[in-house]
C-alpha cells in the first residue's frame, strides 16, 4: 500500500491555454487545502486562486478533488487546472512539493497505481500510452478499444474456458476409479480444440493490433540510379528525396512515415549499393546495410532498362548471399514506362515481382496492396484492439503449450501432462492482463509512459 503522495503535470510540457497538475495519494486533500485555502467538495469544480506559502497568488484556475476509491488511481486525487505556461506550471509544482509527504511522480506512476488498485488491468493501462502515441485514427480507435477492455474480455474468456477444462481434467486424474473414462469420452478433446481455435482467432486480431501500433519497416535497396529515391517520393506522396540522373545522389539514410489504409509504414531509402571509393558514400552504404538487416521487408529495386532478369540471385547474387534469410524480399522492376512492360504484381514469381514506374506512379498502388498482404493487414480496425509485442509472445507461448497438451492427450491419454500444460498456458494468458506479472515486468512497462500518466 502506497503511503506517499505524488505530483506531476498531466498535460504536455510547453505553452498552452490550459495546464493540468495532478496529485494522487493520502496527502491530496491537504495539498488542496494549502494551495486553495479551503476544503474542496468531492467531484465539484471550483474556480479558485492557487496560493504560494506566503499567501500570494501564483495563478487562478479550477480545482477538482476526487476522494478514493472513485478516482483514476483509486486514491485521493486532486487536479489543478491553471494557465498552461511552463513557468506557471513549474511554480505550482514547486509549491506543492513544499508540502510534507509529496514527491515528484515517476513516468507512468499514476497509471501504475490505477493498475495496483484494480482500477484497470495491464492491457488497459498500456492502452493509455498507446492512445497518446497513436499516429492515425485507426490506431487511436484500436487503442480506445483496448482501454475499454475489449482485449481483456477476450483473454478472460479464454482463461475461464481453461479453468473449466482444468477442473474437468483434474477430476479425471483424482478419481480414476470412476467407470467413465473422462479423458477418453471426447469432451476434453472437443473443449481443448475449441480453446485452441478461439486462441488462434485472438492471435490473428492481436497481430493486426500490433501492426497498427508498431508498423512495418520497409527498406528500399539496390544499385545506384535504380529509382529508389523516386519510389520513396511516390510512396510518401512528396519530394522527400533528391532525384537526379547522377549515380550516388543519395548518400545517407532517408526516412518517411506514412499510412496505408491505417497501417503505419516506415519507409527507408538507402544509398545505392556498390563498391564505392568515396569515403562518405562508403559510410552511407554501410548504414544502408545496417537498415537492411533490421527490415521487415526489403524492396529490391532493379532498373528495368538495364536487364531483363527478374531473379535477384541472377541480378545480384552477392546481395542475396549477404541478405539475412528471415527477411522477406520483393523485386521491383522500375521504369516500366520506358520498357513498356505490363504493370502490377506477378504472383507466380518467387520472390514476388512487381513492375511499376516510380516516376509516373503507375503500378505503385499494387505495391501498397502487396505490403499490406505481406504483414497480414486487413485494414479493418472496427472492433479491433491494440496489442504489443509482449502480448503476441504470451499468446504464442500459450498456444504452444495447448498444442503440447493436445498431443499428449491424443497420443498417450497423459492426463497429468495435459493438466500441467493447461496450467502453464493459463499462466501465460494471465501475464497479458497482469494477473500474473513480475515486478520487473511492471517496471519496464510503466517506465515507458509519460510523466503525469
UniProtKB/Swiss-Prot annotation:
Positions contributing to GTP binding: 225-230, 244-250, 269-272, 334-337
Residues bound to (6S)-5-formyl-5,6,7,8-tetrahydrofolate: 22, 79, 119, 453
Sites where the protein binds Mg(2+): 229, 250
GO molecular function: GTP binding; GTPase activity; metal ion binding
Location in the cell: Cytoplasm
Keywords from the named record: Cytoplasm, GTP-binding, Hydrolase, Magnesium, Metal-binding, Nucleotide-binding, Potassium, tRNA processing
Domain TrmE-type G: 215-376
Gene3D superfamilies assigned to the protein according to its UniProt record, in alphabetical order: P-loop containing nucleotide triphosphate hydrolases, Probable tRNA modification gtpase trme, domain 1, tRNA modification GTPase MnmE domain 2
GO cellular component: cytosol
Annotated residues for binding of K(+): 225, 244, 246, 249
Cofactor note: Binds 1 potassium ion per subunit.
EC class of the enzyme, as a word: hydrolase
Assembly and oligomerization: Homodimer. Heterotetramer of two MnmE and two MnmG subunits.
Function: Exhibits a very high intrinsic GTPase hydrolysis rate. Involved in the addition of a carboxymethylaminomethyl (cmnm) group at the wobble position (U34) of certain tRNAs, forming tRNA-cmnm(5)s(2)U34.
Record family assignment: Belongs to the TRAFAC class TrmE-Era-EngA-EngB-Septin-like GTPase superfamily. TrmE GTPase family.
NCBIfam families: mnmE_trmE_thdF, PRK05291.1-3, small_GTP
PANTHER family linked to this entry: TRNA MODIFICATION GTPASE GTPBP3, TRNA MODIFICATION GTPASE GTPBP3, MITOCHONDRIAL
Protein name in UniProt: tRNA modification GTPase MnmE
Gene name per UniProt: mnmE
Amino acid at each position: 500500500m502506497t503511503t506517499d503522495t505524488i505530483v506531476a503535470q498531466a498535460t504536455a510540457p510547453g505553452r498552452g491555454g490550459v495546464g493540468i497538475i495532478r496529485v494522487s495519494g493520502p496527502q491530496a486533500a491537504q495539498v488542496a487545502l494549502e494551495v486553495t485555502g479551503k476544503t474542496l467538495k468531492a467531484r465539484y469544480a471550483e474556480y479558485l486562486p492557487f496560493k504560494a506559502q506566503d499567501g500570494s497568488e501564483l495563478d487562478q484556475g479550477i480545482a477538482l478533488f476526487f476522494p478514493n476509491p472513485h478516482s483514476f488511481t483509486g486514491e485521493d486525487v486532486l487536479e489543478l487546472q491553471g494557465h498552461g505556461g511552463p513557468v506557471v506550471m513549474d511554480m505550482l509544482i514547486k509549491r506543492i512539493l513544499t508540502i510534507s509527504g509529496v514527491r515528484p511522480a515517476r513516468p507512468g506512476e499514476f497509471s501504475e497505481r490505477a493498475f495496483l488498485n484494480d482500477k484497470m488491468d495491464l492491457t488497459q493501462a498500456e492502452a493509455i500510452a498507446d492512445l497518446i502515441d497513436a499516429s492515425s485514427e485507426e490506431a487511436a480507435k484500436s487503442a480506445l478499444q483496448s482501454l475499454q477492455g475489449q482485449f481483456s474480455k477476450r483473454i478472460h474468456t479464454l482463461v475461464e474456458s481453461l479453468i473449466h477444462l482444468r477442473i474437468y481434467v483434474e477430476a479425471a486424474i483424482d478419481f480414476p476409479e470412476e467407470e467413465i473414462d473422462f479423458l477418453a469420452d471426447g469432451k476434453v478433446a472437443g473443449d481443448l480444440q475449441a480453446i485452441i481455435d478461439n486462441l488462434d482467432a485472438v492471435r490473428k486480431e492481436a497481430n493486426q493490433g500490433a501492426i497498427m501500433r508498431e508498423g512495418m519497416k520497409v527498406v528500399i535497396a539496390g544499385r545506384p540510379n535504380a529509382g529508389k529515391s523516386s519510389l520513396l517520393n511516390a510512396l510518401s506522396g512528396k519530394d522527400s528525396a533528391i532525384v537526379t540522373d547522377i549515380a550516388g545522389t543519395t548518400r545517407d539514410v532517408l526516412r518517411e512515415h506514412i499510412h496505408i489504409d491505417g497501417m503505419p509504414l516506415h519507409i527507408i531509402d538507402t544509398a545505392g549499393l556498390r563498391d564505392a571509393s568515396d569515403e562518405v558514400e562508403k559510410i552511407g552504404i554501410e548504414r544502408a546495410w545496417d537498415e537492411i538487416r533490421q527490415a521487415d521487408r526489403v524492396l529490391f529495386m532493379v532498373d528495368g532498362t538495364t536487364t531483363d532478369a527478374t531473379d535477384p540471385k541472377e541480378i545480384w547474387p552477392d546481395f542475396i548471399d549477404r541478405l539475412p534469410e528471415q527477411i522477406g524480399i520483393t523485386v521491383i522492376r522500375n521504369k516500366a514506362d520506358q520498357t513498356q512492360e505490363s504493370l502490377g504484381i506477378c504472383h507466380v514469381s518467387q520472390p514476388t515481382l512487381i513492375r511499376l514506374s516510380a516516376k509516373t506512379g503507375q503500378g505503385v498502388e499494387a505495391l501498397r496492396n502487396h505490403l499490406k498482404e505481406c504483414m497480414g493487414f486487413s485494414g479493418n480496425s472496427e472492433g479491433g484492439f491494440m496489442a504489443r509485442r509482449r502480448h503476441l509472445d504470451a499468446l504464442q507461448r500459450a498456444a504452444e503449450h495447448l498444442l503440447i497438451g493436445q498431443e499428449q492427450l491424443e497420443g498417450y491419454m497423459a492426463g497429468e501432462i495435459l493438466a500441467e500444460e493447461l496450467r502453464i498456458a493459463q499462466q501465460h494468458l494471465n501475464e497479458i492482463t497482469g494477473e500474473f506479472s513480475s515486478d520487473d515486468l511492471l517496471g519496464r512497462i510503466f517506465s515507458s509512459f509519460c510523466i503525469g500518466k
